[in-house]
Amino acid sequence: MPENIIAGIPVHFPFEPYDVQRAYMEKVIICLRDGTNGVLESPTGTGKTLSLLCSTLGWIRTRQSEVQLNMQKLQHDQQTQLTGAAGAGAAMGSEIAAVIGKSNNWGVPKVIYASRTHSQLTQAMRELKRTAYANMRAVVLGSRDQLCIHPDVMREQGNSNKVNMCKLKVHAKSCTFQLRVESKKDHPDFRGPSIMDIEDLVKVGQRLKMCPYFASKELVNSADITFMPYNYLLDPKARKANKIELSNAIVILDEGHNIEKICEESASVQIRSSDVAIAIEDVTHIMKIFTSSSDSQDTAGPDEPKDFTIDDLTLLKEMLLELEKAIDGVIVDNKADGATYPASYMYELLGKANFTHGNCATIVALLDKLVQYLMVASQHSMLRKGGSFMVLADLLNIVFANKGDIMSKVSCSFKVHAEIEESKQSQTNNKAQTGWLGKGNNNAASSASKTGRIINFWCFNPGFGMEQLLNTHVRSVILTSGTLAPLKPLIAELAIPVAQHLENPHIVNEAQVYVKIIGTGPDREQLISNYKNRDNPKYISSLGQTILNVSRIVPDGLLVFFPSYPMLNQCVDAWQASGLWADISSRKPIFLEPRGKDQFTSTMEEFYQAIRDSKGACFMAVCRGKVSEGLDFADRNGRAVIITGLPFPPLKDPKVILKRRYLETNRTRENQLLSGNEWYNLEATRAVNQAIGRVIRHRNDYGAILLCDARFQDASQVQQLSKWIRNHLGARPQSSPFGPIVRELRQFFKHAEQTIVQPVERAVEPVLHTICSKKEDQLTLAPITQIKREPGNTGTSKFQLASELAAKVEMANSIKTWTPADYANAAGRNAQSPKAPNPMDFMSRLNSNVTSIDFNADSGRDLVKIHKRERSSPTFHNESMGSKKRYRLINNIAQSELKEAPESRADFLREVRSVINSDQFRSFGKALLAYKTGGDDSFETLMLLLLDVMGAPKLRYLLHGMRRYLKNEHKSEFDVRLASLEAAQL
């Protein structure tokens, strides 16, 4: 790759950098060289991530070379000085060099690259793989939910349950994957030169039968660059657990427009009355174990840690009872709005139960011991896992992290907000039914019928989180994003010294972007999505007509962003009732942003595939949602974006009210903080800027930006838009009549298609990967958890297949990445003949050749159906079946029921979902997940479920179709079971 000298450092860049990229890299290198901090804004599509990685790692590589030369010189000098004792001198010189080599690369800083989501981190790692620095040591830290490969853990619902199950197995030394980490961590496949993202770690872990989650931690110490989400970086406990050392480190905070909120959240905490009540019950439970074991054999087991006494438990229980009494006594006069108290009130509340700065560390240590004790004790019962103790420990750690010498700062930066919690009696009953609570003592039981409280300790000063980071003695902090402006208030709120700052222009020219404010719809109804107008049916209809007209002009992908989910749902319902939904769908298939992670994955797959259709597709999403924050809609995936309104935070939300009040109270001319109103408006505009940034993704991209809200004409709103967007709107932006906009938009796309080089689609990669990696021809099972019918009046309903292991769909940057042909059919858009199956798609392995002969196609009388099934399993052998045709009489079955299992994966799943109930389908998905990584036991479980769910004659065709999903070693047994079932019913 070409080498460029930037700020005196050789930087390898994939091409000759543009001026904006060179300016950006120069600022980065100056920060690293001088050990200072920087706040750098560069619009989405200017190559920000690539510039950031190349400049940072270019400086690191130069520093490594300098250190290596210094080390060689030192070794040479020492050997020269010790020539009098040649043998000893050489040995000592080698020893010193070895020690130096282990000491954190002897002064070479490590790079910590943090972003908001794993989706963004994966995109960054993909950029790194394309650079000359792809051979540098890199690791990504992920959660158990993403990295764990233990089938028992992955069967658990919810991240907290997975964490607890993992901890139980690790503590009991029963996780074979974790036990292999020590012996496999130096394996060439794991320590190889290639950069491994989440997906790569999982694949290597499965191949080596080694835990990817714990193995990734082993790479941190030797990595040149470590990728992680914000919470891993800002949470001291997470840093310790993941062995993250920040001293002399370079910290990069990418997508930093969220950093203020994340810093505030990292210093905030919540406790409920029910949390304390459960903690009391848990302590009582442990005390009972202690009491019963004093007169008999230890009932809890000899391996449980007992480095605490019954006196410790008694004292803790007394404190918890007092804390429960104090929390329940908090006065909340207005149940709807709650009650707000100064920060000191939290310390008074805890002080009533004798929780103080002085004993905080001791109590937290005791709580950690109790959690470990309960985890071991609950291995068999799985009733108590110490979750309440963890909540209490978090509360104490966060509240008492603020030392007494900064209490004046705490008092103006924090507030206590109390709310009413639902009846503790109902919660207690629910918990008791699941075995979570014991009977407890009389005091706890007597308070169970009282109304509980939720106590929030909210931080409104993001400087607290940044101060913790700076106190670790990092070398440099680089905060960067496409939407940081205005920079001065941001820097003031974060309270960090900033030596370098930058606001870059965009690299695209005027002919590549069309930006317009649409103040009225085709019917001349004003488009304004304020609170008063959102229920106006004329406005909603006009907005739908606007989207319909735009969908007729925009080629390929159209993105439509709404201010909130309620507004999106309201519009969808109204358009379905009026027929507008069907009209838009006839132009472009519509995809809605789902709120669940699993559904989101499959929806994005379907959207990317639909883009290949000549009509393209329309994706309706929400500002601040996953689509607006983390996804890339380059080229055909997003040719236009419609912003339907300004996504202001809820005006009456207590946290919003208190944040505005905090800014007004603490704002001075010197600190340049925003006013409460300015912050409120900026929150909406930053979300808009993020949504707009999904479209223009690179130098040769083009697209239209349509702001469909009359309020965008206000000068205050325009000034908060990204600088490059303001340049396209002009000095005095005004909305234009709808007719001219339609003509201009049509002309814009016509000109762009003629003058701008269209992207060349690369060969696609298979979406789904195999489970059985030993043999290429072995069958694979992707997890199937839920299929959801999208709302709509058209006859082409869309189905969403959720896939927990297909998280890489969130990372799809373009249609170049995805080509599963069955998604088009799943959406009901193509009724064409099926194409040849993709051998890498597990559903395409439905390769048992089946022929059906209907001897009575023209009548409704008794039908005879002949099946000839050629077994695909090389291990299958049954002389009784051989090549002999099997005849089966099917009495009085309607013509519509004579059918085979659908060939395509999506159609098959749609068929299954349509004929069984939701509980059966949920069990079906779980059984497939278990079978995916399990052995004979999991096959037996799956087989029993299939016979139960699909054993009826009318569903037998689905049971036959399921054979195609099985691993080769289980097909023979499946055939025997199926033959027995059919013989019994003849």
Swiss-Prot record:
Keyword Nucleus: yes
Positions bound to ATP: 42-49
GO molecular function terms noted in the UniProt entry: 4 iron, 4 sulfur cluster binding; ATP binding; ATP hydrolysis activity; chromatin binding; DNA binding; DNA helicase activity; DNA polymerase binding; metal ion binding
Superkingdom, natural source: Eukaryota
PROSITE patterns cross-referenced by the UniProt entry: HELICASE_ATP_BIND_2
Listed Gene3D superfamilies: 1.20.1160.20, P-loop containing nucleotide triphosphate hydrolases (3.40.50.300)
Enzyme class: isomerase
Motif DEAH box: positions: 254-257
Modified residues (Phosphothreonine): 875
Catalytic activity: ATP + H2O = ADP + phosphate + H(+)
One record GO biological process: male germ-line stem cell population maintenance
CDD domains assigned to the protein according to its UniProt record, in alphabetical order: DEAHc_FancJ, HN_RTEL1, SF2_C_XPD
Entry keyword annotation includes Cell membrane: no
Keyword annotations: 4Fe-4S, ATP-binding, DNA damage, DNA repair, DNA-binding, Helicase, Hydrolase, Iron, Iron-sulfur, Isomerase, Metal-binding, Nucleotide-binding, Nucleus, Phosphoprotein
Binding site for [4Fe-4S] cluster: 148, 166, 175, 211
Coiled coil: none
GO CC list: nucleus
Family: Belongs to the helicase family. RAD3/XPD subfamily.
Functional description taken from the UniProt entry: A probable ATP-dependent DNA helicase implicated in DNA repair and the maintenance of genomic stability. Acts as an anti-recombinase to counteract toxic recombination and limit crossover during meiosis. Regulates meiotic recombination and crossover homeostasis by physically dissociating strand invasion events and thereby promotes noncrossover repair by meiotic synthesis dependent strand annealing (SDSA) as well as disassembly of D loop recombination intermediates.
Matching NCBIfam families: rad3
HAMAP family: RTEL1
Protein name listed in UniProt: Regulator of telomere elongation helicase 1 homolog
